[in-house]
C-alpha cells in the first residue's frame, strides 16, 4: 500500500493529513462519503491505482487525541 498515493503522491501537510483521516476513514464523517468526497477506494482508482482501503496506522494528524487513526492507503 502507498500512503502518499491517496494524496496524489505528495507529502502531506498537517491540515491535509487531518483531512485525509477525517474525510475518508472515520465513522463520524462517513455520511459525507460519496457526497462531499470520494471513498478511499474510489479516490485511489481516480489516481490510477487498483483500489484502496482504510488501514489503522499511526496518526499523522497533529490535532487528534489518539496515536492511531484509519488512513486511506492505495493498492499498487
Swiss-Prot record:
Intrachain disulfide bonds: 18-25, 40-44, 54-61, 72-74
Cellular location(s): Secreted
Origin: domain of life: Eukaryota
Keywords associated with the record: Disulfide bond, Secreted, Signal
GO biological process entries: defense response
Keyword Nucleotide-binding belongs to the record: no
Entry GO terms, CC: extracellular region
InterPro entries for this protein: Macin, Macin_sf
Family: Belongs to the macin family.
Protein name (record): Neuromacin-like protein
Organism of provenance: Aplysia californica (California sea hare)
Amino acid at each position: 500500500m502507498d500512503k502518499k498515493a491517496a494524496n496524489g503522491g505528495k507529502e502531506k501537510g498537517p491540515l491535509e493529513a487531518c483531512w485525509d483521516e477525517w474525510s475518508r476513514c472515520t465513522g463520524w464523517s462517513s455520511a459525507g462519503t460519496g457526497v462531499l468526497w470520494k471513498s478511499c477506494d474510489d479516490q485511489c482508482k481516480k489516481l490510477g491505482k487498483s483500489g484502496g482501503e482504510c488501514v489503522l496506522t499511526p496518526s499523522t494528524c497533529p490535532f487528534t487525541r489518539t496515536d492511531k487513526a484509519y488512513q486511506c492507503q492505495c493498492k499498487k
